[in-house]
């Protein structure tokens, strides 16, 4: 189990509602982005983390790329396969082959 998970999102309410119980199964503490944080601080938090569970966003992709450079083989990046409905059957083309890919979640991506 992890000691702590820090959630960075522009919709922490959705994250707490949809992911809170799941995250608490794996981490002693779940922290959510404070309302006073800045985009630069959020990016620094994500990019310097050795383990990232990202979203289908440019912000997360770049955080994962930078984490890979900083932490090398010790970096673990988990990203969803889904990106956008109108492209390539919804699958993200930006995924690094070194990342772990989540194909689906319980209830689906819209659930």
Please report, for each region that a protein language model flagged, where it lies by residue:
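N-terminal targeting/anchoring "stem" of glycan-biosynthesis enzymes
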Residues: 1-111
